[in-house]
Amino acid sequence: EIAQCLVGSEMCIRDSFMAAGLILSAAANLIIGIAGFLNGDGYIGNAIFFLTFIILWGINGWAQSMGGPPGIVSLSRWYPLSTRGTYYGFFSASHNLGEFFSFLFVGAIVGLCGWHWGFAGSAVAGAIGIAIIIALLHDSPESKGLPPIEVLTGEEKSEEHKARSTRKMQRTAVRNPLVWMLALSSACMYVARYAVNGWGVLFLQEVKGFTLVEASQIVSVNALLGIFGAVCCGWLTDRFLHGRRNVLAFIVGLINTAALCLFFFSGSGMSINILSMVLFGTTIGILICFLGGLMAIDIVPREATGATIGIVGLTSYIGAGMQDIISGRLLDAHKVMIGSETHYNFTPATLFWIAASTLSFLLVLFVSRKQQGKEHDNRYCLLYTSDAADDLI
């Protein structure tokens, strides 16, 4: 993740970098579909196909990580600070929209033609995306013969940043404690996010007595509301809070934690549990947008946005992975066997999830930038790091 972001920041052809990733992803999907058609019967044929699938799916996942960093860096190049949040909100919601249309598009193809054609259909969708990237995505205003965005909008770029190379700014961002504090806040938020996504259905079944279908319907509400939260959050801070996103992130984090408590400690009524997921889904969409990217690119120079996104992204997914391990061990340590049935005590895991959510919104208070009019003071980029020290690294 960090390597892709560093490369995506340094390259002057971010559109080509993103297109290359999508080409690899589309090719992997197409080959999997073709391999499915050619797969022979028997143990050896199935083993070969399985190995092929594992390799290509790994390539697919790696290639898809080449999409986010160039997109975020391009956003920071093309849009001024005063409207960056608004456009980043739409960008953040694109992941949810992509999943939604994937279910409709690929699901329909698989239902009509079989799973092999589902991969082929995904490859076609990727080809369309490649054409859009090549035709419409451009690296920066300068790449199209325009002045930098600072000149176009009247923003001032500090002399400190003018004197530093992209690589030096990236190294400064990596040493910035505020970047790591934001990354830790995002990791804690991901603990709460994947706690609900991963364990919410089982919790509703075990603790509140819902059926599998009912529990799945309740938890699915939060995914849909995440789109609404992501789209609205950037515009709200641009319009009413003048870019002070940590203030809104703190308030939203507080509501998110309250929604978790409502979900885990309320009764078994359908309405109250749906309400908790409405609140949780909306707020988690906002927090993913803020902590997962927008605040990260606010506190560093444009030249270091890719490296910062890489740090936050990697730390967030480490948090999600640790959540699975810790939650699984807590649930396993407190399970009770009644006859042949296993029942889980969710109390220790629930306290862990709520504690992580609380720590997330407390940490975010310390991460901010100062904006006065159209000037962006990046004093949080740790100017104590001298150029001489940079040259020694």
Give the ranges of each region predicted by the language model.
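Helix-loop-helix hairpin linking two adjacent transmembrane segments in secondary transporters
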Residues: 96-139
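C-terminal ends and interior cores of transmembrane alpha-helices
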Residues: 23-45, 255-268
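Hydrophobic core of transmembrane alpha-helices in multi-pass small-molecule transporters
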Residues: 28, 44-65, 272-287
